[in-house]
């Protein structure tokens, strides 16, 4: 049976126990033009100066928050009920969608009818929503009609992170090298609309996922992080995957992909979506393959189509579709050192060879678009021929597939379906800029979403590092979202600790890229932490860090038992050799001399 909320999170309340950033932080909400636009942020309040002085200056720093109600002490979260449907009123007031009388997917109806006592089913049976006759419900469609939706206003507030409230000291920032990005000092709802209308950004928010807090993926916005979870035929259960999702967003996952390939895929996904405040992505071909007993040759358009509808009606926000794997590219892929390393790519390759014809993902793409626009499912056009080794980087198969993805992007845009493009993979550092340039050239500026790339193949067990190195460079060049890699990459299914390490490594990469691009306000957090470090405000340093618990734990473990945490040194230099302590004493001495 599904475990209770407190058994998964470690607390009887709605707040996740030991949440990232609880040290010196609190959750706040910024209200928009209407009371139901409430944007969550982390507020870090820091006292600057002597703690016993009444005139102590307070610095407030606001950070992007992906953790949803799970970190709100005032929220009574129950995973058996799911999260509040915060977007439901926005969806209903547009009057362009309808609630269906039953599920449209045959498989979905079968799963509902086949429920047995004791099964791990989400308690609430909800009816899905889809576009009304002749209507298009995508955020791109609204944007192209000149409509600024509540989702767009929500995103503008979220991306700005209350930069206007920063003290001047923290606003100082190096210009950066934007490399073609176009970032205004203030993100407005109209700017969000314009970027979505042009296809340069996507808002992955299915109308059947009203629990989703709107976010945006685009090269002119903050770099985002995706975390992969999902069971396999060999390990994991539904409650473990829900736990991993909550854990992933706690550490900063902007989106989560459920890549389950084991049993109970439908039920696992329902639990995850109903409890997720971030967009959920999937690779539908995985579940379609399960439906035919793992035999790729037995796949059909009819089974895949039903799977798309099933998942869209559950609320999946974006689909990875490997429609760029064309039969004419298979020979080039066979010449590689490591062949085809994408699961979706290899599945469709096997199908194409068995049937001697083009992939139905490509030939039926117009019909796939019709499904997507009825629910506002964003496409993540999969790189089924991405290089799986440095040896194969930027080869013919990869680049020719990219051209096909550009063709499919234009097809999707004719339907006002939102699109992002998946990228490699394994690419050495000196070839990363070329990857970005080719993506922009062939895919018309659609957001790039890359798996790293890993910049070397020699680090099994440390591939979260090789990926973060490549991800930093690729995001600086223009990638909009990085898919995290964990230490278990190439080795096995990640656990909670792997998820944490993978996300933190890629949050570092994303932030470093924002700094390099000169993203407005990106340096404020660095400035605040540096000031706290120079003033030996240890708790403030921890609060501003990406992993406060780890930093605090390391310091505590290294201090002598009788030492207080107010000491103005660490065990690296000790009390007599700390350069910052010496510098401070010199400053204080100089100031005292001037007063005399």
UniProtKB/Swiss-Prot annotation:
InterPro entries: ThiC, ThiC-associated_dom, ThiC/Bza_core_dom, ThiC/BzaA/B. Its cofactor is [4Fe-4S] cluster. Pathway: Cofactor biosynthesis; thiamine diphosphate biosynthesis. Keywords: 4Fe-4S, Iron, Iron-sulfur, Lyase, Metal-binding, S-adenosyl-L-methionine, Thiamine biosynthesis, Zinc. It is an enzyme of class 4 (lyase). [4Fe-4S] cluster binds at residues 570, 573, 578. One of its GO terms (cellular component) is cytosol. Disulfide bonds: none annotated. The keyword Transmembrane helix does not apply. Substrate binds at residues 228, 257, 286, 322, 342-344, 383-386, 422, 449. Zn(2+) binds at residues 426, 490. Its EC number is 4.1.99.17. Binds 1 [4Fe-4S] cluster per subunit. The cluster is coordinated with 3 cysteines and an exchangeable S-adenosyl-L-methionine. Gene3D superfamilies: 6.10.250.620, Radical SAM ThiC family, central domain. Catalyzes the synthesis of the hydroxymethylpyrimidine phosphate (HMP-P) moiety of thiamine from aminoimidazole ribotide (AIR) in a radical S-adenosyl-L-methionine (SAM)-dependent reaction. Homodimer. This is Phosphomethylpyrimidine synthase 1. It comes from Syntrophotalea carbinolica (strain DSM 2380 / NBRC 103641 / GraBd1) (Pelobacter carbinolicus). The gene is thiC1.
């Amino acid at each position: 049976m599904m475990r209770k909320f407190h058994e998964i999170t470690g607390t009887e309340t709605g707040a996740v126990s030991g949440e990232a950033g609880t040290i010196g932080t609190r959750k706040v909400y910024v209200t928009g033009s209407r009371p139901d636009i409430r944007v969550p942020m982390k507020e870090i309040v820091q006292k600057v100066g002597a703690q016993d002085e009444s005139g102590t200056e307070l610095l407030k720093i606001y950070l992007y928050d992906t953790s949803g109600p799970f970190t709100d002490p005032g929220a009574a979260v129950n995973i058996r009920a799911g999260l509040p449907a915060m977007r439901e009123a926005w969806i209903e007031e547009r009057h362009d969608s309808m609630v269906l009388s039953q599920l449209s997917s045959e498989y979905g109806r079968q799963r509902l009818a086949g429920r047995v006592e004791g099964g791990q089913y989400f308690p609430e049976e909800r009816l899905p929503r889809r576009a009304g006759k002749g209507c298009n419900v995508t955020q791109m469609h609204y944007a192209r009609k000149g409509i600024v939706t509540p989702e767009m206003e929500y995103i503008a507030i979220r991306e700005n992170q209350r930069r206007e409230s920063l003290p001047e000291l923290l606003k100082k920032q190096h210009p950066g090298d934007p490399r073609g990005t176009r970032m205004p000092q203030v993100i407005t709802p109209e700017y969000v609309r314009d970027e979505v209308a042009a296809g340069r950004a996507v808002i992955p928010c299915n109308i059947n996922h009203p629990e989703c807090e709107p976010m945006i993926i685009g090269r002119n916005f903050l770099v985002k992080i995706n975390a992969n979870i999902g069971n396999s035929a060999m390990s994991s259960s539904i409650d473990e995957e829900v736990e991993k999702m909550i854990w992933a967003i706690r550490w900063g996952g902007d989106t989560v992909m459920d890549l389950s390939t084991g049993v109970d895929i439908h039920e696992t996904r329902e639990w995850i979506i109903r409890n997720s405040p971030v967009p959920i992505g999937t690779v539908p071909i995985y579940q379609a393959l399960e439906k035919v007993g793992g035999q790729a040759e037995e796949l059909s358009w009819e089974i895949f189509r039903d799977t798309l509808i099933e998942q869209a009606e559950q609320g999946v926000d974006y689909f990875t579709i490997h429609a760029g794997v064309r039969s004419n590219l298979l020979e080039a892929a066979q010449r590689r050192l490591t062949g085809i390393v994408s699961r979706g790519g290899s599945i469709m390759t096997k199908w194409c060879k068995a049937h001697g014809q083009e992939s139905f993902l490509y030939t039926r793409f117009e019909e796939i678009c019709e499904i997507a626009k009825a629910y506002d499912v964003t496409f993540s056009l999969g790189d089924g021929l991405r290089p799986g080794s440095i040896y194969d980087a930027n080869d013919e198969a990869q680049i020719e597939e990219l051209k096909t993805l550009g063709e499919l992007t234009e097809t999707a845009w004719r339907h006002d379906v939102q699109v992002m493009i998946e990228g490699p993979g394994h690419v050495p550092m000196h070839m990363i800029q070329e990857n970005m340039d080719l993506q922009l050239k062939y895919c018309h500026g659609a957001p790039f979403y890359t798996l790293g790339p890993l910049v070397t193949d020699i680090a099994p067990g440390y591939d979260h590092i090789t990926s973060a190195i490549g991800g930093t460079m690729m995001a600086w060049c223009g990638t909009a979202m990085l898919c995290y890699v964990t230490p278990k990459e190439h080795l096995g299914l990640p656990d909670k600790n792997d998820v944490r390490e993978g996300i933190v490594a890629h949050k570092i990469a994303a932030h470093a890229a924002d700094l390099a691009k000169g993203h407005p306000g990106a340096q404020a957090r660095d400035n605040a932490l540096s000031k706290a470090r120079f003033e030996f405000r240890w708790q403030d340093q921890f609060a501003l860090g990406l992993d406060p618990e780890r930093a605090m734990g390391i310091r505590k473990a290294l201090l002598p038992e009788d030492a207080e945490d107010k000491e103005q040194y660490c065990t690296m230099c000790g009390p007599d050799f700390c350069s910052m302590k010496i510098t401070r004493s010199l400053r204080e001495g100089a100031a005292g001399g001037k007063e005399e």
